[in-house]
Amino acid sequence: MGIENLVQNDVVLTRLDALFNWGRKNSLWPMIFGTACCAIEFMSAVSSKHDLSRFGAEVMRFSPRQADLMIIAGTISFKQAPILKEIYDQMCEPKWVVSMGACACSGGFYDNYTTLQGIDQIIPVDVYISGCPPRPEAIIDAILAIQDKISNESIKDRHKDYKGLLDA
């Protein structure tokens, strides 16, 4: 007996969406991929003054298999790009990405042949944080934007390969 026999209309799915999204948005497990000064600025966002853990992003993960939010902070070179892509592929689904700082968003002032001009060329980015380096308040705003995005997601949209099973 599969879910297609249990679900006859979208009422159950909307309730499940609300439940899953509430749990996911309030228990983000971030992993920082820090390569430059933005990673140092991220430390102030998790300090006691700003306390990022108030927003559900308390437990920092250092393994991509345990993280669902990747925060890329700093310059990414073309040599690092395959490594970043591999780490992104190792993350569990659903996963979200925050591009933190001018270097991660657009290459910053490193406009040369070795620097990737924005990480969105290799992985999808959900939220961009501008600044060089961005303030801790901007990092908190990005976490709130990710939580807002999670609140509006649906199980049907998240698992496109199982769409036939979820539609009655």
Swiss-Prot record:
Its cofactor is [4Fe-4S] cluster. [4Fe-4S] cluster binds at residues 37-38, 103, 132. Keywords: 4Fe-4S, Cell inner membrane, Cell membrane, Iron, Iron-sulfur, Membrane, Metal-binding, NAD, Quinone, Translocase, Transport, Ubiquinone. Pfam families: Oxidored_q6 (PF01058). It is a peripheral membrane protein. Its main location: membrane. GO terms for molecular function: 4 iron, 4 sulfur cluster binding; iron ion binding; NADH dehydrogenase (ubiquinone) activity; NADH:ubiquinone reductase (non-electrogenic) activity; quinone binding. It catalyses: a quinone + NADH + 5 H(+)(in) = a quinol + NAD(+) + 4 H(+)(out). NDH-1 shuttles electrons from NADH, via FMN and iron-sulfur (Fe-S) centers, to quinones in the respiratory chain. The immediate electron acceptor for the enzyme in this species is believed to be ubiquinone. Couples the redox reaction to proton translocation (for every two electrons transferred, four hydrogen ions are translocated across the cytoplasmic membrane), and thus conserves the redox energy in a proton gradient. HAMAP family: NDH1_NuoB. This is NADH-quinone oxidoreductase subunit B.
